[in-house]
Amino acid sequence: MENFPIINLEKLNGAERVATMEKINDACENWGFFELVNHGIPHEVMDTVEKLTKGHYKKCMEQRFKELVAKKGLEGVEVEVTDMDWESTFFLRHLPSSNISQLPDLDDVYREVMRDFRKRLEKLAEELLDLLCENLGLEKSYLKNTFYGSKGPNFGTKVSNYPPCPKPDLIKGLRAHTDAGGIILLFQDDKVSGLQLLKDGRWIDVPPMRHSIVVNLGDQLEVITNGKYKSVMHRVIAQKDGTRMSLASFYNPGNDALIYPAPALVDKEAEEHNKQVYPKFMFDDYMKLYANLKFQAKEPRFEAMKAMESDPIAIA
């Protein structure tokens, strides 16, 4: 079986640049996921983020999660749970405006560390978007500019912990879905696994690696690339032992950004005969639809947006 794509970003600076770019392109076309090493974020920064995130969970969130589990009677379930996930989360919004000062449970050291980490992730996300542009034959910054609404992009981090689960066969850590947004950068636990992606009808483990960043593509990049790159179904399997940490940072279009296939990637004949596979829409409209259909296939969402495009009153 094919190996999960691992990209060494340092190789972009030397004789292996062409081969590395080809590897990124293949990962985007055939996996929708890849894992970065030597990505430029210092290991000591990642170690500090991990230490403080795990400490925050133990101090502020672990007991709340135990109380929620007890309240819902989840430890004694006998049938599959399909309406919730075995995860404890909070969300840090970075752009267009930050909420990090408003979250009550974070101490000042954690806030400052996460502000620094966010800047590094934002820079990396934009560098990756430019690499995708290069592979796609689009002008530099095309994707970044497409993501810019009137207030810039949306960027935020979902901080998740997946505690030990007594019934991992009946409760998912996170149910299968594709991500709605643009490009997602994941800093995950290297000791407790659980993330899987769907490839060729099989669930494949995303290997946990120390100090790596896992990258996956969201629905918006599938639309903009006219299907050349794909968003892929993925899930988190709950584990009986160990608490898994996950920080998923979503670099998404701004709410009023207009999303549609890049003209350079659209077949002219299909365009002339109005046989477009992908719709044109405002990102916020897609997110409103996604909120109710997250754990379903993406194709009906695209079709619903096409219907809205042709008859907005019918969907309103």
Curated annotation (Swiss-Prot):
Its cofactor is Fe cation. Fe cation binds at residues 177, 179, 234. Pathway: Alkene biosynthesis; ethylene biosynthesis via S-adenosyl-L-methionine; ethylene from S-adenosyl-L-methionine: step 2/2. GO terms for molecular function: 1-aminocyclopropane-1-carboxylate oxidase activity; 2-oxoglutarate-dependent dioxygenase activity; L-ascorbic acid binding; metal ion binding. Leaves. Induction: By wounding. Its EC number is 1.14.17.4. PROSITE patterns: FE2OG_OXY. Belongs to the iron/ascorbate-dependent oxidoreductase family. This is 1-aminocyclopropane-1-carboxylate oxidase 2. It comes from Solanum lycopersicum. The lineage of its organism: Eukaryota, Viridiplantae, Streptophyta, Embryophyta, Tracheophyta.
